[in-house]
UniProtKB/Swiss-Prot annotation:
<feature type="domain" description="KH">
    <location>
        <begin position="302"/>
        <end position="370"/>
    </location>
</feature>
<comment type="similarity">
    <text>Belongs to the NusA family.</text>
</comment>
<dbReference type="Pfam" id="PF13184">
    <property type="entry name" value="KH_5"/>
</dbReference>
<dbReference type="GO" id="GO:0003700">
    <property type="term" value="F:DNA-binding transcription factor activity"/>
</dbReference>
<dbReference type="InterPro" id="IPR010213">
    <property type="entry name" value="Tscrpt_termination_fac_NusA"/>
</dbReference>
<dbReference type="GO" id="GO:0003723">
    <property type="term" value="F:RNA binding"/>
</dbReference>
<protein>
    <recommendedName>
        <fullName>Transcription termination/antitermination protein NusA</fullName>
    </recommendedName>
</protein>
<dbReference type="InterPro" id="IPR010995">
    <property type="entry name" value="DNA_repair_Rad51/TF_NusA_a-hlx"/>
</dbReference>
<dbReference type="Pfam" id="PF08529">
    <property type="entry name" value="NusA_N"/>
</dbReference>
<dbReference type="GO" id="GO:0005829">
    <property type="term" value="C:cytosol"/>
</dbReference>
<keyword id="KW-0806">Transcription termination</keyword>
<dbReference type="GO" id="GO:0000166">
    <property type="term" value="F:nucleotide binding"/>
</dbReference>
<dbReference type="InterPro" id="IPR013735">
    <property type="entry name" value="TF_NusA_N"/>
</dbReference>
<comment type="subunit">
    <text>Monomer. Binds directly to the core enzyme of the DNA-dependent RNA polymerase and to nascent RNA.</text>
</comment>
<dbReference type="InterPro" id="IPR030842">
    <property type="entry name" value="NusA_bac"/>
</dbReference>
<dbReference type="InterPro" id="IPR010214">
    <property type="entry name" value="Tscrpt_termin_fac_NusA_C_rpt"/>
</dbReference>
<feature type="repeat" description="2">
    <location>
        <begin position="440"/>
        <end position="490"/>
    </location>
</feature>
Length: 496
């Protein structure tokens, strides 16, 4: 039997390409499981196999705990230390017992456990093997095609899955076809697929360029950003770290060979290679290619840009179903609003008119000064109150005295507006206090009612149960009781 164990370990290790230690551990687990089935009680068993001789020893063990809940598997610390041995909590006390005989049932049980443990070891090794390739392109052969996914054979008993959303539109494969995709998921689950590949992710595009353009791998050219509408169109932004090299030209290749190779792999996906620029406005202008941008207005606070194009360029700038502007927005990270130059002029004229009326209403200053401020792009009191004073002095045709007056006026108005806001809050708090006179009412519930514009007992009395059921932690019965209490106070009592 000892020689047979060593032979099994050697055979399985060679067949499955697994370490011998993993097979020994699987055998020990199998023998322990078979031994447990020989006993009526639920006991804990450990089996130790001699790695050289193949002989094995069986131990029954108990865990050392403070309070015993499973007498057949646990022992108290006091009992464990009875013989004077040094034992600590969560240690094990072991006792050698007779090893199991290999009858038919024992052999079948051991076989099942070994198969399971070997499979787990294979899956763990597969995860470890492919984890380092996450984010890289790997190649597989179509093994099986299902309705929602494709199973790929990666070789060496490794399989990967491409989900339907990971494929490109109108892409059809047959068993035996060779497919390339980006490995994006390596999962150690005990069941189901462990490796997931995609052809629709943006990383697929960037990795293909990394393969086709040696300068990217050498870090002479850097991919800064990319955006895709898989199978249709993409934009990729590149930057050179060597001023002697044109990054766009290098990615396009001689007669477009490099970009064409990438496009062919992605079912003819149209790819715009654009030059990266650290200036967001200039980068957006580059990203809007092939459309020509007439002017651009940046709103850093809202993280938006208004892009004006000639009316003849509008359709091209927006793209089919908004594709061009959508990809430009994704690759730049800015919200882009495309319009004609006439529309942009009208919009700014309207905004200037609104800002002029706002400042005229809230600032006690000359209209000519307001026109100067609006022309410089100011539209809020906060800007005037908190902009560095030296920047305010740089405004053309604005004297230092006028700048001081503008700043003081803006701060005073903001303080007044804050005071009015506080008064309103105080008034709301007063009405909330009135609601607190009702039995069963608390401050949190009164605040929730105030958020629904219910400030007084009379307003609460006019409500129906359905009006209050969306309030958190308030059920229909409680809502009805509150409403009836309010009605009793308002309608049937002369005082609270």
């Amino acid at each position: 039997m000892n020689k047979e164990i060593l032979a099994v370990v050697e055979a399985v290790s060679n067949e499955k390409s697994l370490p011998r230690e993993k097979i020994f551990e699987a055998l020990e687990m199998a023998l322990a499981t078979a031994t447990k089935k020989k006993h009526e009680q639920e006991i804990d068993i450990r089996v130790s196999i001699n790695r050289k001789t193949g002989g094995f020893t069986t131990f029954r063990r108990w865990m050392v705990v403070e309070t015993v809940t499973q007498p057949t598997r646990e022992i108290t610390l006091e009992a464990a230390c009875f013989d004077g041995e040094k034992v600590y909590l969560n240690d094990y006390i072991e006792e050698q017992i007779e090893s199991v005989d290999f009858d038919r049932i024992t052999t079948q049980t051991a076989k099942q456990v070994i198969v399971q443990k070997v499979r787990e070891a294979e899956r763990a090794m597969l995860v470890e093997q492919f984890r380092k390739y996450t984010g890289q392109i790997i190649t597989g052969i179509v093994k099986k095609i299902n309705r929602d996914n494709i199973m790929l054979d990666l070789g060496n008993n490794a399989e990967a899955l491409i989900l339907r959303e990971g494929m490109l539109p109108r892409e059809n494969f047959r068993p035996g076809d060779r497919i390339r995709g980006i490995l994006y998921g390596v999962y150690p689950e005990a069941r189901g697929a462990q490796l997931f590949i995609s052809r629709s992710k943006t990383e697929m595009l960037t990795e293909l360029f990394r393969i086709e353009v040696p300068e990217i791998g050498e870090e002479v050219i850097e991919i800064k950003a990319a955006a895709r509408d898989p199978g249709s169109r993409a934009k990729i932004a590149v930057k050179t770290n060597d001023k002697r090299i044109d990054p766009v030209g290098a990615c396009v290749g001689m007669r477009g060979a490099r970009v064409q190779a990438v496009s062919s792999e992605l079912c003819g996906e149209r790819i715009d290679i654009i030059l990266w620029d650290d200036n967001p406005a200039q980068f957006v202008i580059n990203a809007m290619a092939p459309a020509d941008v007439a002017s651009i207005v940046v709103d850093e606070d809202c993280h938006t840009m208004d892009i004006a194009v000639d009316i003849n360029n509008l359709a091209q700038a927006i793209g089919r179903n908004g594709q061009n502007v959508r990809l430009a927005s994704q690759i730049s990270g800015w919200e882009l609003n495309v319009m004609t130059t006439e529309d942009l002029h009208s919009k700014h004229k309207e905004e200037a008119h609104t800002a002029f009326n706002f400042f005229k209403k809230n600032l006690n200053i000359n209209e000519n000064i307001i026109k100067i401020l609006v022309k410089e792009g100011f539209s809020s009191l906060e800007e005037l109150a908190y902009i560095p004073f030296n920047e305010l002095l740089e405004v053309k045709n604005l004297t230092e005295d006028q700048a001081k007056k503008v700043r003081e006026g803006a701060k005073s108005k903001l303080l007044l507006m804050e005071s009015d806001k506080n008064k309103m809050i105080i008034q709301e708090r007063k009405t909330e206090k009135e609601l607190l006179k009702i039995n069963g009412m608390n401050a949190v519930l009164a605040l929730q009612l105030a958020e629904k514009n219910i400030f007084t007992i009379e307003e609460l009395a006019d409500q129906g149960i359905d009006d209050l059921t969306d309030i958190k932690n308030l059920n229909s019965e409680q809502a009805g009781l509150l409403i009836m209490t309010a009605r009793n106070i308002c309608w049937f009592s002369s005082k609270v």
